[in-house]
Amino acid sequence: MLSHADLLDARLGMKDAAELLGHREAVKCRLGVGGSDPGGHPGDLAPNSDPVEGATLLPGEDITTVGSTPASLAVSAKDPDKQPGPQGGPNPSQAGQQQGQQKQKRHRTRFTPAQLNELERSFAKTHYPDIFMREELALRIGLTESRVQVWFQNRRAKWKKRKKTTNVFRAPGTLLPTPGLPQFPSAAAAAAAAMGDSLCSFHANDTRWAAAAMPGVSQLPLPPALGRQQAMAQSLSQCSLAAGPPPNSMGLSNSLAGSNGAGLQSHLYQPAFPGMVPASLPGPSNVSGSPQLCSSPDSSDVWRGTSIASLRRKALEHTVSMSFT
């Protein structure tokens, strides 16, 4: 059977085999191992010799990995943390991980009802107690100052959340209109605008509209004050006819006519709606029919002589004139 040296001689030649054997002898001397057995061949290995002695170092290999098996090399490559430290203790990285796991464990504090009552009473006084108040409270209820501080932090967060929820449901802006929005027009203003538009939509020179409007205008009821004034004027005229005209009847009739005319004007030309402005009157003898709602110039001619004011005025003048005849 051929030895290891014979195989090297056959494969690599004498020169290469000598170089490899010399390199192996140098490694043995470096590791403090004696030379080869004098009775054996320089290339043979002893039965109980170190596997490093029989290994051949190639130029790219390290001495520490020569005697290692492939299985041990694979395990060391997969779990570098399991390798022992320089003094045989645990690896520093593994010890750091164990300390991190121990720090992550947190113990939940269970408060007794008496402790909770005392904490709530202090929270009602102030939401941000100082260090002295926390230490005093911790000594009183048998807790640490850090536990009391954490309880106050959690209690403040719960209080703020509850306050925000109640403010959302009780906010006045959710039920009332926004102040920036335009206000809705009143019913009177809307009716006045509708009446003005309906009156102005007809043409001012249309005689059919004036003729059709006369019966409806004549059938309008009188205001209560105007009816009382007319009845009083008729009763005064009848009394003057029965007793005869007194010396100052002319002044009385003139004052009565003037007062009745002023009353007519004051009652008839009060605006029906706040937004409508009455037209000015030129004098007591020339009374226009109604407020000037349209902006056309011929509307005054159409309304003149057809309104209830002019008819009542003529009736009153006729009654006063008949009282002197």
UniProtKB/Swiss-Prot annotation:
Binding region for DNA? 104-163
For the keyword Transcription regulation, the answer is yes
For bias type Gly residues, the affected ranges are 32-42
Cellular location(s): Nucleus
Q: Which domain of life is it from?
A: Eukaryota
Low complexity compositional bias, start-end: 90-102
Provide this UniProt record's keywords sorted from A to Z: Developmental protein, Differentiation, DNA-binding, Homeobox, Neurogenesis, Nucleus, Transcription, Transcription regulation
Keyword DNA-binding tagged = yes
The record, for PROSITE patterns, names: HOMEOBOX_1, HOMEOBOX_2, OAR
Annotated region Disordered: the residues are 32-112
* Gene Ontology cellular-component terms listed: chromatin; fibrillar center; nuclear body; nucleoplasm
Signal peptide span per the entry? none
* Protein family (similarity comment): Belongs to the paired homeobox family. Bicoid subfamily.
Name the PANTHER family on file: HOMEOBOX PROTEIN ORTHOPEDIA (PTHR46770:SF1)
Protein name in the entry: Homeobox protein orthopedia
